[in-house]
Regions:
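Conserved loop->alpha-helix
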Residues: 1-206
Length: 206
């Protein structure tokens, strides 16, 4: 489980496909100049959110962190758009006693969305996303949504489009700074919205 508060940015160093995919990631500090020492305490088998995708750490070698990515994960997320040099958001899993600064995030990507526009407004950024119509019912104004692993508040919604505001700190400390029009992002729906929809279906069936 995660909170959607990004601690570091990772850079894809290699992508290898045999049956599934293997990726290696270097964890970089916010100044992009050095490996983040805080990640050297990770143990093999640990869960790490990589742009909102919960992946299992399988190997650490030469300051690179290796993960496997299955076909199921690749087909349901934006993974197939990742390339060497691609920046991703990184969050270690939540521990008992940690501060919950965002909302509960599970690392289970529901769908993807496309960046429609990015507007800078006095140092902050307004980003509009186009998402799959089947999931629009889960996006509510002032509700929570996870975009590439980041816990955010929905500012406005209109049909299949919703927008969020990104403050300067979040922009500079996440992979959002590399977004362009047409970028594909991972979306995780707030778990409360999913359960409410399930309860509503059960109620209607009865």
């Amino acid at each position: 489980m995660f909170t959607g508060i990004i601690s570091h940015v990772g850079k894809i160093e290699s992508i290898t496909q045999i049956k599934d995919w293997e990726i290696s990631i270097s964890i970089i500090d916010y100044d992009s100049s050095s490996i983040a020492s805080s990640f050297h305490s990770l143990i093999l088998g640990a869960s790490v959110a990589c742009s909102g995708i919960c992946l299992t750490l399988k190997k650490i070698e030469n300051n690179f962190f290796f993960f496997d990515v299955s076909h199921e994960t690749a087909n349901k997320t934006n993974f197939l758009s990742w390339k060497v040099g691609y920046l991703i958001n990184i969050e270690r899993s939540l521990k008992v006693g940690d501060e919950i600064g965002g909302h509960f995030v599970y690392g289970h990507v529901d769908t993807t969305a496309i960046v429609k526009s990015i507007d800078e407004i006095k140092g902050s950024y307004k980003i509009r996303f186009l998402m799959n119509g089947n999931f629009r019912k889960f996006i509510a104004q002032k509700g929570s949504v996870t975009i590439d692993g980041v816990s955010l508040t929905v500012n406005k919604t209109k049909q299949n489009i919703f927008c969020v505001n990104i403050i300067p700190f979040t922009w500079s400390h996440t992979c959002f700074r590399s977004y362009k029009k047409g970028s594909i992002v991972n979306i995780e729906i707030d778990v409360l919205a999913r359960y409410l929809e399930k309860l509503q279906k059960i109620s209607l069936d009865n």
